[in-house]
Curated annotation (Swiss-Prot):
Name of the molecule in the record: GTP cyclohydrolase FolE2
GO molecular function list: GTP cyclohydrolase I activity
Any single GO BP term: tetrahydrofolate biosynthetic process
Alphabetical list of Pfam families matching this protein: GCHY-1 (PF02649)
Pathway named in the protein's UniProt entry: Cofactor biosynthesis; 7,8-dihydroneopterin triphosphate biosynthesis; 7,8-dihydroneopterin triphosphate from GTP: step 1/1
Enzyme nomenclature, EC number: 3.5.4.16
Reactions the enzyme catalyzes: GTP + H2O = 7,8-dihydroneopterin 3'-triphosphate + formate + H(+)
Length: 367
């Protein structure tokens, strides 16, 4: 007797479907709900007398009185701490993974005004080993909040970083705190005063067993073009023609690595270095006599973007508390439709063959 197997790709008729359903129901009658669900949760729809397990009658009111106790929490899934088999993509180490821009008020020590409470944007990241699926991001915030009531310094940042490394079982970590730092400044001649705000970031990095303390500061100043100044004077002297040199708002981002045993480098110290190097800082409160004084100050300190980088460099080199550093300057031209930029680094910390494509656009302060 010859038996011919039915082609599985052949379209079944109703009789075939009835036979298949009978077989399925006989199997399901002996199987558990878990076995049925593992095969296909939709099978429950075909079984007489059973509830639709994939369409439960869910509660729709928020349970205010529900207690997520310890035993309940132990049942919650934790995918980020799952096995390496859950990793998607290449099983490679990730140098930085964490959270950016969580904000809270933080108190800081200052050189001249005691302690200040400032709104601070915090970024915390850790390294992730190749065989680990991920990290629990909330642990970074919880670790940081343990120290949030303290008056912050690099020593407190060190303690927070230690908690990151311990809580997340990582080898490397980075903590950055970014804020706007107010300093009261005097006008040039009128005696008025107002607050100048400086974008400051503190960064603590542990990498390959080494720990680095870094301060970033944006300094905003006016730059008068030396060439334009001379051309304007030539027009006046040679032809009696009134002319004005072009000047523009300019920004330098100063990044310095602090020497471990060099003592405290205050925010105000770094600002003072910038003012001595390039004294044409933009003004806060201005009357006519201040505006005239600022014109005279710019004429006495004309500066190309190359000059700016070297003058800031000279000021930083004079401070034993400063190790490696980088100066990024941007003169946002009033003559040209492009900007003039320069980058000067000293040491290996900030040396890089590639620059962030958006680096110079971040130096445009929009308020």
């Amino acid at each position: 007797m010859n038996i011919h197997s039915r082609d599985v790709n052949e379209t079944p008729d109703r009789s075939d479907a009835e036979q298949a359903l009978a077989v399925l129901r006989r199997w399901a009658g002996e199987a558990s709900e878990t076995e049925v669900a593992q095969l296909d949760p939709a099978i429950a729809r075909l079984l007489p007398g059973q509830e639709l397990q994939n369409y439960p009658d869910l509660k729709r009111q928020y349970p205010d009185d529900f207690d997520a106790n310890e035993s309940y929490r132990a049942t919650l899934p934790d995918l980020q701490n799952g096995p390496s088999s859950l990793i998607r993509g290449a099983k490679e180490q990730i140098q930085h993974v964490g959270i950016s821009n969580f904000r809270l008020p933080i108190r800081f020590h200052t050189r001249d005004n005691g302690d200040l409470t400032l709104e601070t944007s915090v970024t915390g990241t850790v390294s992730l080993d190749a065989e680990k699926k991920g990290i629990n991001m909330s642990r970074i915030m919880r670790s940081f909040y343990k120290h949030a009531e303290k008056v912050f310094s690099f020593d407190v940042m060190e303690a927070a970083l230690e908690d990151y490394l311990s809580d997340l079982e990582s080898g490397d970590a980075r903590l950055q705190m970014r804020f706007s730092f107010p300093v009261k400044v005097q006008s040039l001649r009128s005696g008025l005063s107002g607050y100048q705000y400086y974008d400051v970031a503190l960064e603590l990095v542990q990498m390959a067993g080494q720990r680095h303390r870094i301060v970033h500061l944006d300094y905003v100043y006016s730059s008068t073009c030396p060439c334009s100044l001379e051309l304007s004077e030539h027009a006046r002297q040679a032809r009696g023609q009134l002319a004005t040199p072009h000047s523009q708002r300019s920004v330098a981002r100063i990044s310095v690595q602090m020497e471990q045993d060099g003592g405290c480098l205050w925010f105000e110290d770094l600002i003072d270095h910038c003012r001595r190097a390039v004294p044409t800082e933009t003004q806060v409160m201005v009357k006519r006599e201040d505006e005239q004084a600022f014109a005279e100050l710019n004429a006495a300190n004309p500066i190309f973007v190359e000059d700016a980088a070297r003058l800031f460099c000279e000021a930083l080199q004079s401070d034993a508390r400063v190790g490696d550093f980088r100066v990024v300057a941007s003169h946002q031209e009033s003559l040209h439709s492009h900007d003039a930029v320069s980058v000067l680094t000293q040491g290996t910390m900030f040396a890089a063959p590639s620059l962030d494509p958006q680096l110079f656009s971040t130096l445009i302060h929009r308020g």
